[in-house]
UniProtKB/Swiss-Prot annotation:
The modification Phosphothreonine is found at residue 218. Keywords: Acetylation, ATP-binding, Nucleotide-binding, Phosphoprotein, Repeat. This is ATP-binding cassette sub-family F member 2. It comes from Homo sapiens (Human). Residues 1-51 are annotated as: Disordered. Residues 39-51 have a biased composition (Basic and acidic residues). ATP 1 binds at residues 118-125. Signal peptide: none annotated. It comes from the Eukaryota. The keyword ATP-binding applies. Pfam families: ABC_tran (PF00005), ABC_tran_Xtn (PF12848). GO terms for molecular function: ATP binding; ATP hydrolysis activity. GO terms for cellular component: membrane; plasma membrane. Residues 86-325, 396-613 form the ABC transporter domain.
């Protein structure tokens, strides 16, 4: 029988459950009370929107099913079925008949955080999908959560979307409310409450709110409808769900895409505490360094394992490859020497012939035991921005500029005053919504100032790379056809092939329809197109999304060799460190120059997280 204290506790929780079930006359929406008649008026429109969302969701699911059908995976579980470690041998993976992995091993150990790296198009995302859909033999007791796409737009709030993902907790709470409403036996109710306590049910909303806050959602945003957010923000909600559920195996594919630097720093600190199995694909060396305990290199149809973060991987791999090449050259020298000796003395005197036979046996043993292979290096890229010529300063002058999107809307910038020229190398940083992309649009003329003036040199050409540039590509054309169409002055196809080849698109990729290319390859088409605009100023808004690490390094080298000016918006700390000479912070309707480098700014963001934590805990207690 339960104690008196337990009975009182159960009675209290029962009353709270009943209170939650009482109908309300209205609910809060963006700070305003919305009554039931107002809700009813929206039903017809919402019904239409829901139908469209359902159709889009079904299309995405069908697409994923087609991809899965074109994928073939084989492998054998080598670890104990009850183990929390996963060891799979003889792993092979093919997609549309193309072999991505061949007779390799997958080793994922509990408590380790793995960074999965490799060139664009090599099959990293395909491998994550195969693991997430259990196409490899992973024991059932290991639950897997694979973050695949953004949340579809709906009337749900981000907070609700995050909390509903914990299905066991939601089911237990629903059952507890039902029993409380029916005035059921106290013992059964107590069992449910005990299980909910184990799942931190009382703290679930606080934890969900903390995660959303870390990813940039203010308290008001957490209660807005999902359909009012852009795709990037809905992707953050999907990421928050993945973090909230705490699966035993968490699979993240480019989790920092669509995040600002503040959210990247928070996510890095959050993932550092993940104690189960984490596998993430990321193009950010800085992020991989901060999070990962191990690196998996997908290369030459094999998975190769390295202990340590990304920097340690680079060091270890270089040492191993140097030793491998030394061994390779030594073996080749030995083989050449023995073959030469056998050819010269194999038919000589008896003594020399015996020595030749001995060397032939040694050679056969070497060949039978397996020779060291030559190191196959990743293909190196060499991006190129053509010379733009000189124009005298000032190239762009910003004079007392203020901007707001609507007459009654909030002011994004107030009285900006600065100039930029061909020597400018600036990274714009600051939280989402502070106006970084807005500033680039103002400077290009895509947006006009509400007040003030922006003066540009009459001959200046500006090239702006942004996240939606891919949408402007003609997907039915090949990269070669698209570039020939955009730049008809280049008559020879071979010349254009060389141009495109510098951006990592070679052979069949140049003549395949753009729709068949990976996101990273489409980005390269956009970069090639941008470069041959021959701009004086490069405005780069998140250029690293979908690019691999080697491509980002090639882009950084090209920017550093570029004769013109550059303004960059990026969540990649390492790229900023490589190319930016100044850091400008966009915040509170103005722009201020940061006194240090980007690494000092990152430490500043970390210290802000520490300062905000007590305030956040206090605020979420009052939710």
């Amino acid at each position: 029988m339960p104690s008196d204290l337990a009975k009182k506790k159960a009675a209290k929780k029962k009353e709270a459950a009943k209170a939650r079930q009482r109908p309300r006359k209205g609910h809060e929406e963006n700070g305003d009370v919305v009554t039931e008649p107002q809700v009813a008026e929206k039903n017809e429109a919402n019904g239409r929107e829901t139908t469209e969302v359902d159709l889009l969701t079904k299309e995405l699911e069908d697409f994923e099913m087609k991809k899965a059908a074109a994928r073939a995976v084989t492998g054998v579980l080598a670890s104990h079925p009850n183990s929390t470690d996963v060891h799979i041998i003889n792993l092979s993976l093919t997609f549309h008949g193309q072999e991505l992995l061949s007779d390799t091993k997958l080793e994922l150990n509990s408590g380790r955080r793995y960074g999965l790296i490799g060139l664009n198009g090599i099959g990293k995302s395909m491998l994550l999908s195969a693991i997430g859909k259990r196409e490899v033999p992973i024991p059932e007791h290991i639950d897997i959560y694979h973050l695949t796409r953004e949340m579809p737009p709906s009337d749900k709030t981000p907070l609700h979307c995050v909390m509903e993902v914990d299905t066991e907790r939601a089911m237990l709470e629903k059952e507890a409310e039902r029993l409380a409403h029916e005035d059921a036996e106290c013992e059964k109710l107590m069992e449910l409450y005990e299980r909910l306590e184990e799942l931190d049910a009382d703290k679930a909303e606080m934890r969900a709110s903390r995660i959303l806050h870390g990813l940039g959602f203010t308290p008001a945003m957490q209660r807005k409808k999902l359909k009012d957010f852009s795709g990037g923000w809905r992707m953050r909600v999907a990421l928050a769900r993945a973090l909230f559920i705490r699966p035993f195996m968490l699979l993240l594919d480019e989790p920092t895409n669509h995040l600002d630097l503040d959210a990247c720093v928070w996510l890095e600190e959050e993932l550092k505490t993940f104690k189960r199995i984490l596998v993430l694909v990321s193009h950010s060396q800085d992020f991989l360094n901060g999070v990962c305990t191990n690196i998996i290199h997908m290369h030459n149809k094999k998975l190769k394992y390295y202990t340590g973060n990304y920097d340690q991987y680079v060091k270890t791999r270089l040492e191993l490859e140097e030793n491998q090449m030394k061994r390779f050259h030594w073996e080749q020298d030995q083989i050449a020497h023995m073959k030469n000796y056998i050819a010269r003395f194999g038919h000589g005197s008896a003594k020399l012939a015996r020595q030749a036979q001995s060397k032939e046996k040694t050679l056969q043993k070497m060949m039978a035991s397996g020779l060291t292979e030559r190191v196959v290096s990743d293909k190196t890229l060499s991006f190129y921005f053509p010379p733009c010529g000189k124009i005298p300063p000032p190239v762009i002058m910003v004079q007392n500029v203020s901007f707001k999107y609507t007459k009654d809307g909030p002011c994004i910038y107030n009285n900006l005053e600065f100039g930029i020229d061909l020597d400018t190398r600036v990274a714009l940083v600051g939280p989402n919504g502070a106006g970084k992309s807005t500033l680039l649009k103002l400077l290009t003329g895509e947006l006009l100032p509400t007040d003030g003036m922006i003066r540009k040199h009459s001959h200046v050409k500006i090239g702006r790379y942004h996240q939606h540039l891919q949408e402007q590509l003609d997907l039915d054309l090949s990269p070669l056809e698209y570039m020939m169409k955009c730049y008809p002055e280049i008559k020879e196809k071979e010349e254009m092939r060389k141009i495109i080849g510098r951006y990592g698109l070679t052979g069949k990729q140049q003549v395949s329809p753009i729709r068949n290319l990976s996101d990273g390859q489409k980005c390269r088409v956009c970069l090639a197109w941008l470069a041959w605009q021959n701009p004086h100023m490069l405005f780069l808004d998140e250029p690293t999304n979908h690019l691999d690490i080697e491509t980002i390094d090639a882009l950084a080298d090209a920017i550093n060799e570029f004769e013109g000016g550059m303004m960059l918006v990026s969540h990649d700390f390492r790229l900023i460190q490589q190319v930016a000479q100044e850091i400008w912070v966009c915040e509170k309707q103005t722009i201020t120059k940061w006194p240090g480098d980007i690494l000092a700014y990152k430490e500043h963001l970390k210290s802000k997280l520490v300062d905000e934590e007590p305030q956040l805990t206090k605020r979420t207690h009052n939710v």
